[in-house]
Amino acid sequence: MKRNLALLPLSSIIIMAVLTESSFANAEIESLAELSGFSEVPQIFSEALGTAAIKGNGTLLNYQINMTGIGQVTGVDIHQGEETENGDIVVTLFRANASEGPLNGVLAGTITNSSFQGPLAGKGMKDLTDLISQNRTYVNVYTTKFPNGELRGTIVTRGNLSVDSGTNNGSMPTTTG
């Protein structure tokens, strides 16, 4: 009898860990970033502006980036880093190539665990969402005019939301421009 009681606390810990992870996988999160040249490090002047919306759960994140007044976009990344520093790329969202043609100001897609690189390579979605909730990630948009970045914005979490009961489960469009 003592043997079974001794295992009870251990089994409770295991059950709590499983419940916590599955609760995270079902939690809806929403984050936003306002993109401008003034957020670049160092700051640059650009008339271009943009927004990045990220929404999803512990399994995947959908993103949509809208840009106006921008020239030829050559790349878009999510970086790990504070607002005042340049950090490592953790997710590549876009790289220009001849077959895709130019980006017209709207970029949308999905981030999964296989998207991670740099400090997040081999890690899970929770690692990225933890960084986002700590305001330690930013979106950076590169152009031919500003190869080190024309638009940048810290990704700020909007909290946990209830799962949308609609047919798209709250996901954003995945059409690229």
Regions found by a protein language model. Name each.
Residues 1-10:
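Bacterial N-terminal signal peptides that target proteins for export
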Residues 9-18:
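Bacterial N-terminal signal peptides
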Residues 3, 14, 22-24:
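Short, intrinsically disordered, low-complexity terminal segments
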Residues 21-76, 80-177:
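Metal-centered catalytic cores of metalloenzymes
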